Every structure is written in structure tokens, then in C-alpha cells.
Design a protein with these regions (language model features):
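Beta->alpha turn/N-cap motifs
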Residues: 1-10, 100-101, 109-111, 116-122
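Stable alpha-helical elements in mature extracytoplasmic
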Residues: 4, 58-62, 154-157, 161, ...
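Ligand-binding "clamshell"
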Residues: 11-23, 38, 110, 115, ...
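A conserved helix-loop-strand patch within extracytoplasmic ligand-binding domains
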Residues: 19-72, 171
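Periplasmic-binding protein-like
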Residues: 25-35, 60-67, 122-163, 165-187
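Ligand-binding cleft/hinge of the Venus flytrap
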Residues: 61-97
């Protein structure tokens, strides 16, 4: 499949006694912080509500992203599976509303800001470079990847698929058609 990053895959493996493995990183989908009302992070008022994903890996990722941008500080050693309870410093007393990933786009209307992937922002006609208050830097562990069962990851069919999706033609297609939502994660 192509819909998960390696940390989400590992959480799936742990929770389902599964053995999925990353075959090939495919593209980066960086989180962004979007607001319907505010145009910069400095405009986001004290006590504003920020919608974040409620599943463990994406919540942790969203909080790590906000920490990297200086919005909050997490307890030392929190790691990627942080929760709202791990927030140590929150200078503007933001409130964090945890919602299902599929609700984040709707929260664009209801919350002061929403942490979303480009795939959720695009249907709202939002792009990271023009509309996001903040955009996550690409992180290899979060690249959407071709994933397979461990027992067939090296099969000829899977390897042909990996080769096809990382071709120069696919790279060019992604760069030309999805520059802000699917930057190639392969060379």
C-alpha cells in the first residue's frame, strides 16, 4: 500500500501482530497549520483552539511539528508518540482539540487553526506555501511509503512496483503536478 509512513506502519504492526515493512519511500506530505481567520502564527490569539489528529502517531507528529516551530514545548524525552498531556510549555495557552483525521478539514471552519496534511487542505483550496501559518520540514520517517508484508517485500512483483514508482518519469510527474502535496521522497 501507499498510505502510511513508517511510524504509523510500526504502530499498526505492534497493535495487529503484523509484519509490514517499508519497501520504498515514495513522497513527503508535510503537515501544515491552517487557519480560516488568521494569516500568521503571530495573529493566532492566546487561548486559541488548535485541532490536531487524535490517533497516536499523527497526534505525536503534530505536537512534534508545533514544538519544532516554537509553538509549544514537550517534556524532555517525549518522542514521537507524545500526547497533549506531554506539553510542558504552552506560552499562549492554546487549547488542543483532538479529532479524527477525517474531521480536520471540517475543523478549519470550527477551530481557530487546524493541523492538516495537504491531502485534507487541497479540497479546501488551500496550499502550504500560500495558506499555511506553518509548514513542517520533510522528515524521512514520515514519507508516505510503499509498504508490503515482510514475506513478500522482496518478491519480483513488489520490486518491479518499487522500481516503477521511483522512476524519473514519476518523479517529474509528482514535481510538476503535486509540488506542494507530494514531493518525491526518493532520488
Amino acid at each position: 500500500n501507499f498510505f502510511q509512513h513508517s511510524l504509523w506502519m510500526q504502530a499498526f504492526n505492534d497493535n495487529n501482530d503484523s509484519n509490514l515493512v517499508v519497501v520504498e519511500p515514495f513522497y513527503h506530505a508535510e503537515m501544515g497549520l491552517y487557519s480560516k481567520e488568521y494569516k500568521t502564527i503571530d495573529e493566532l490569539p492566546e487561548g486559541a483552539t488548535i485541532a490536531v489528529p487524535n490517533d497516536p502517531t499523527n497526534l505525536g507528529r503534530a505536537l512534534a511539528f508545533l514544538e519544532a516551530e516554537g509553538v509549544i514545548q514537550l517534556k524532555e524525552g517525549t518522542g514521537i508518540y507524545g500526547t497533549v498531556q506531554d506539553i510542558e510549555e504552552n506560552p499562549k495557552n492554546y487549547k488542543f482539540e483532538e479529532v479524527d483525521m477525517l474531521m480536520l478539514a471540517r475543523m478549519y471552519d470550527d477551530a481557530d487553526a487546524s493541523v492538516m496534511y495537504p491531502s485534507y487542505a487541497m479540497p479546501l483550496n488551500l496550499t502550504p506555501s500560500k495558506d499555511a501559518l506553518l509548514v513542517e520540514d520533510p522528515i524521512d520517517d514520515f514519507a508516505i511509503s510503499l509498504v508490503a508484508r515482510e514475506d513478500n517485500a522482496d518478491s519480483e512483483l513488489i520490486q518491479k512496483l518499487a522500481e516503477a514508482i521511483t522512476s524519473p518519469e514519476v518523479k517529474q510527474y509528482l514535481e510538476e503536478n503535486y509540488p506542494e502535496s507530494a514531493a518525491p521522497a526518493f532520488e
